[in-house]
């Protein structure tokens, strides 16, 4: 399959239309990178799925930042209103797994092979949890970011889904003004919006930019 030509948003819309016609409400394990990015995705997908938000981000640095972000995620879920149930599941904050994956890639630019490995690490854990929990689908909020390559994310997600035996929900949440809406929702709910992706390497790069 040539994923280069796939319009992920249209593929998602086709599925959602079919689910409505069949009057089905599947279960979805939604990997969330942070509360702001999840805000629009939850507003959108909770119209069609029973969702469990899976917060698994061992890349986040420092630990105080991890704590801040996970608390914001829980706060958002508690305050938003959904058509179908949305629950929360915290993954293990296992930084060693991230650093093991990133070994030798410390100097790679953001958006390169280190980031691809980070996506795969988090999506594999998500797929494993989805299988164990009997979920119909799994996906991630990551494609809402203008900085994230939706094609790469979907390629990794599909491959991981095939490996683990669970359906990956194709998506490009930045489409249809998804990113803009996430900013609006962040304001409505008073969410903390970080200025770096999450890992130690992106944190240090951001600090260096601020010093210029």
Annotate the PLM regions.
Residues 1-40, 45-212:
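Nucleotide-activated chemistry modules centered on ATP-dependent adenylation/adenylyltransferase
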